[in-house]
Amino acid sequence: MKIFFFIFAALILLAQIFQARTAIHRALICKRMEGHCEAECLTFEVKIGGCRAELTPYCCKKRKKD
């Protein structure tokens, strides 16, 4: 019975690690698009997609002046 709880805890930890990897991957994509992760974009920035699931959901990019 103790081994069951150990395996269950290990699976929860693995799930957390894989979520962190995808967040890092999304942040790298955002950086390649010359943006940055913020919860709210400034008035002169544009939302270009998701960055992380919970903490900072938006990737912002500065607008180009015409």
Curated annotation (Swiss-Prot):
Stated role: Has antibacterial activity.
InterPro entries: Beta_defensin_dom (IPR025933)
Compartments it resides in: Secreted
Similarity annotation: Belongs to the beta-defensin family.
Pfam family, one: Defensin_beta_2
Gene Ontology cellular component list: extracellular region
Keyword hit for Lipid metabolism: no
Coiled coil regions, renumbered to chain: none
GO biological process, one term: innate immune response
This protein's UniProt keywords: Antibiotic, Antimicrobial, Defensin, Disulfide bond, Secreted, Signal
Residues making up the signal peptide according to the UniProt record: 1-22
Protein name from the UniProt record: Beta-defensin 107A
S-S bonds: C37-C51, C41-C60
